[in-house]
Amino acid sequence: MKSEPDTFGINDLYNKPNQTEHWDGVRNYQARNMMRDDMKLGDLVFFYHSNCDVPGIVGIMEVVKEGYPDFSAFDPDDKHFDPKSDPEHPRWIMVDVKYVKTLSRTITLKELKTHEELADLALVRPGNRLSIMPVSKGQWEFILSLE
C-alpha cells in the first residue's frame, strides 16, 4: 500500500490512537477491488512511501477491518469527495490498517528493481502506479530477507 509521506507516512500511522487508521481516498477501481475482494482480516501489507526523495518499503501493517464504504467519498468538504458515490450505493471502499513495525531500513524502489526474484512484482514493472498492489508469498518473504 502506497502513501506519500508528506500526506500520511509510517510515523503518522505509528502516532495514531491504537496505531490504527482507515485507508481512505483510493480512487482507482483496480485498487478498490483489491481492497474489497482480496484484503482479509489479519493480512500483513507493506507500507510504501511514494513520491518522495527515496521511495521504498518502510514498514509493515496489518489489515484489522476488511473492506467497507469509504465515507470520505460522501463528504463534499473532503478532497476525496465523489458526487457519484453515496451510502446507499458506495463506489469506493477502504480497509483499516494497524501499524506492525518500521523496517530497520528503507528497501528502496531502486534496490527492488535489481533483484531477478522480484521481476514479476507489480511495483517494479513499468506503468504500474496503483496505490495498492499484490505481493505474492514468495515476493513477501524475499523482500523481508532484504531488511
Region locations from a protein language model:
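Compositionally biased, charged N-terminal/linker segments
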Residues: 1-41, 139-140, 147
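Structured loops at beta-to-helix junctions and adjacent beta-edge loops in soluble globular domains
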Residues: 2-4, 48, 100, 127, ...
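A short secondary-structure junction signal
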Residues: 11-13, 73-74, 108-110, 143-146
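Hydrophobic/aromatic beta-strand segments within beta-rich folds
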Residues: 43-46, 95-97
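Hydrophobic beta-strand signal
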Residues: 46-47, 62
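Short, charged beta-turn/beta-strand-edge "cap" motif at the junction between a beta-strand
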Residues: 48-55
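Aromatic- and Lys/Arg-enriched surface recognition patch
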Residues: 59-130
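Charged phosphate-binding loop/patch that engages nucleotide di/tri-phosphates or the phosphate backbone
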Residues: 129-147
